[in-house]
Regions:
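Blade-edge motifs of beta-propeller repeat domains
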Residues: 20-34, 76-86, 117-141
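Structural motif
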Residues: 11-17, 65-74, 109-117, 168-177
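Exposed, low-structure sequence patches enriched in small/polar residues
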Residues: 35, 43-48, 63-65, 69-96, ...
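Repeat-based blade/solenoid architectures
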Residues: 12, 32-45, 83-98, 130-148
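Catalytic cores of extracellular degradative/oxidative enzymes
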Residues: 1-77
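Acidic/hydrophobic-patterned starts of short beta strands in beta-sheet-rich repeat architectures
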Residues: 1-7, 51-63, 96-109, 154-163
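Blade-level signature of beta-propeller repeat domains, shared across WD40, Kelch, NHL, RCC1
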Residues: 151-177
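Calcium-coordinating acidic loop motifs
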Residues: 22, 47-48, 97, 151-153
Length: 177
């Protein structure tokens, strides 16, 4: 078993690493840490079925918020990491959305698919394409995360639960947690 982790310690001088869980042996370390000292977030997953088919022993790809490229399982830079014009990069969350074996990228209320061979993305949902998760907002401004991502219906794809911008009810609740 292996472990992928993002480092937030500016003195470790590594943005993310991939290690053997039992021994701690490094399989790769991605780059030198940024001057700001905050990598903050990162992901690793099979996000491109075509890449996985041509690299069956190394199907996962990884990236973090401090570096500009996607890395394979031995730490080689492949292409530019996924980004969304005006919305930052997709370092937060992954979701099984379109029914294939690869995960899609989720940031705030935008869902995209990444293609490792070209370093490009295809947007499924987002503010600029008319297919928005209407009225949905992420939980916080900096991390832009949903409340829950899970396969609730058991159909392989995952559902996304987010707060709505304007919530109302005909029954007022006075108790708060």
């Amino acid at each position: 078993q292996e472990v992928f982790s993002v480092k937030e310690d500016q003195y470790k001088k590594e943005g993310c690493s991939f290690r053997v869980a039992a021994t701690g042996q490094k399989l790769f370390t991605a780059g030198v840490h940024t001057a700001s000292g905050d990598v903050g977030r990162g992901v690793m997953a099979n996000i491109d079925d075509a890449y996985a088919a041509s690299n069956p022993n190394a199907l996962a790809l990884a990236w973090d918020s401090a570096h500009s490229n996607v890395h394979n399982l031995i730490g080689e830079d492949l292409k530019a990491k996924p980004s969304s014009a005006g919305n930052g990069s997709f370092d937060n969350f992954l979701v099984y959305w379109d029914g294939d074996l690869g995960r899609e990228l989720l940031d705030a209320n935008i869902i995209q698919k990444y293609f490792a061979s070209t370093g490009t993305t295809k947007r499924f949902y987002g503010p600029s394409d008319g297919y928005t998760l209407t009225g949905a907002s992420p939980n916080n401004y900096t991390k832009r995360t949903p409340s829950l991502v899970a396969d609730i219906w058991g159909d392989w794809r995952e559902e996304i639960i987010m707060p709505v911008n304007k919530a109302s009810s005909t029954e007022q609740a006075y108790l708060r947690i």
